[in-house]
Amino acid sequence: MTTSSNQQVVLAARPDGDLKPTDLRLEDVAVPTPEDGEVLLETIYLSIDPYMRWWMRAEKSYNDPIEINQVIVGATVSRVRQSRHGDWQVGDWVLAFSGWKHFAISNGSDLRRLDPDVAPPSTALGVLGMTGFTAYAGLRNIGKPKPGETVVVAAASGAVGSMVGQIARLRGARAVGITTGAQKLSYLTDELHFDAVADYNAPDFAEQLAKACPDGIDVYFENVGGKIWDAVLPLLNTYARIPVCGVISQYEKPSGAQENIDRLSNTMTQIMGKSLTLRGFIQTEYAEEQLADFLQEAGQWIADGKLRYREHMTQGLHTAPQALIDLLKGRHFGKTIVQVGEP
């Protein structure tokens, strides 16, 4: 490897409201050199995920916030370009957490080996990665759908939502997807075989959702929040389960903003009155015990043509800021990925 150019994207300013391209900065830095026990990784594919915007806030959540001038965090599919580590060879494909940079150093402890003959490497960021496992773990551990029950998911044409609906159907449940726009609605019913859909931007959204769920909602996979939650709440059945993996509608609210302050008290009343189970989760809490099960089961579903996925891929690290902005605005289907290097 002879290149001496290494690009990275850092947080230039803390966003207040909608993320702007000027909140991020593309920099040129030197390619690092591995020491004994280390490898040099080249990022081939970079995962773009909603949580990245949440970590740009000043407030700590389940992780420390990204600091000003710090490289944006993110999962990557990378290749070993130089190795001074006995377990890793030049050319190996790995899943890493290198962040928004072209080249990175690793001591190998945070790497997972990938086999490109088993599945396209980019799938380790989506359908066979964090997003797919988020859907799997949330349903397996919290949602626990039973045959014949109704499972509703918002942002249903996105990376997580599209997996939630398909896995629910594979478990014998009805899948109802919430999204907006004719193309996304038809994608859910025609390609992913959701049982019903509702358009959250339609004036009669609440009526559409009620019609799609004539027997109520048994599982609501929450990843959006806001007005969608307001429409879902009255339809929840007694003992319904609500896995919460995100509230993307709130990620770009200005710091300290409060909206519909009485929403929490109404939610708490419903939780008590209907004996609801509502639990937030981060997929990593289940990974050690269940990731292998997921990879085996999901891999078989894909091989059998039972689990479908889409990837929206842009080219070049410089496209990552706009890719995240577009993701937060719901402009694309499926999993958003940036191709940074050449395989």
Residues of each region from the PLM?
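NAD(P)H dinucleotide-binding glycine-rich loop of Rossmann-like/cofactor-binding domains
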Residues: 72-78, 89-155, 197
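C-terminal hydrophobic helical "lid"/dimerization subdomain
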Residues: 2-4, 285-343
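Glycine-rich phosphate-binding loop and adjacent beta-alpha segment
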Residues: 227-306, 340-343
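Short amphipathic alpha-helix with an adjacent loop that forms part of the alpha/beta core around
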Residues: 204-215
